[in-house]
Amino acid sequence: HLILASALICALVVCTFAEEQVNVPFLPDEREVKCIGWQEYCRGNLPCCDDCVMCECNIMGQNCRCNHPRITSECGSRR
């Protein structure tokens, strides 16, 4: 059972990693948004998108997409 569970976990990890590698075409204006990872709230200790509160990027921090426009100036241009 342990071997079967390990194989299942490995398959899941491989599938998840392969899914991350898919390049989804974004609109040109969305492609310019830069951020690292996914964050819901901008804090001083997290990378923050200039124009977004929530951003989604691929594993390399590129092809970022803004999901929610910034409503307040909470984010500013913090890096």
UniProtKB/Swiss-Prot annotation:
Tissue specificity annotation: Expressed by the venom gland.
Propeptide boundaries: 19-31, 78-79
S-S pairs: C35-C49, C42-C55, C48-C66, C52-C75, C57-C64
Keyword Secreted: yes
Keywords: Disulfide bond, Knottin, Neurotoxin, Secreted, Signal, Toxin
Places the protein is found: Secreted
Signal peptide: 1-18
GO molecular function: ion channel inhibitor activity; toxin activity
GO cellular component terms, A-Z: extracellular region
InterPro entries: Spidertoxin (IPR004169)
Name of a matching Pfam family: Toxin_9
Family: Belongs to the neurotoxin 02 (plectoxin) family. 02 (plectoxin) subfamily.
Function: Potent toxin that may paralyze and/or kill insect pests such as H.virescens (lepidoptera), S.exigua (beet armyworm) and M.sexta (tobacco hornworm).
Comment on protein domains: The presence of a 'disulfide through disulfide knot' structurally defines this protein as a knottin.
Protein name per Swiss-Prot or TrEMBL: U1-plectoxin-Pt1c
Natural source organism: Plectreurys tristis
